[in-house]
């Protein structure tokens, strides 16, 4: 069971790319007064900390098949991001089983 993730949740970072945040695109469902994340929500682009200092973005790719928010899959802690990163933060009060 993982927590439901919300706007500005941090990611874990991957390889030489540091952690960044995920940006909510929907504004109808909230946890703790903060918009929850759904499939396709973008990360703030992040830049490698070593040469060639490439910058890339990515979008959330939720694993749940049971929980939907505004018609899209809900994002939870440990869900992958298309660039290889992972969602690393979530609500401590709302969980997806």
From Swiss-Prot:
Q: Where in the cell is it found?
A: Virion
Q: Which Gene3D superfamilies match?
A: 2.60.200.60
Where this protein primarily resides, as one coarse class?
A: virion
Q: Which GO terms describe its molecular function?
A: lysozyme activity; metal ion binding; peptidoglycan beta-N-acetylmuramidase activity
Q: Where do the annotations place Fe cation binding?
A: 14, 46, 56, 83
Matching entries from InterPro entries are given as:
PAAR_motif
Q: Which Pfam families match?
A: PAAR_motif
* Cofactor annotation: Fe cation
UniProt keyword list: Iron, Metal-binding, Virion
Top-level division of the source organism's lineage:
Viruses
Q: Which residues form the signal peptide?
A: none
Q: Which GO terms describe its cellular component?
A: virus tail, baseplate
Which purpose does this protein serve, as stated in its record?
Baseplate central spike complex-associated protein. Makes the tip of the central spike which probably punctures the host outer membrane, a necessary step for viral DNA ejection into the host cell.
Tell me, how does this one assemble?
Heteromultimer with gp27 trimer and gp5 trimer; this interaction forms the tail lysozyme complex that creates an extension of the tail tube. Part of the baseplate macromolecular complex which consists of gp5, gp5.4, gp27 (central spike complex); gp6, gp25, gp53 (inner baseplate); gp7, gp8 (intermediate baseplate); gp9, gp10, gp11, gp12 (peripheral); gp48 and gp54 (proximal region of the tail tube).
Q: What is this protein called?
A: Baseplate puncturing device gp5.4
Q: What is the primary gene name for this protein?
A: 5.4
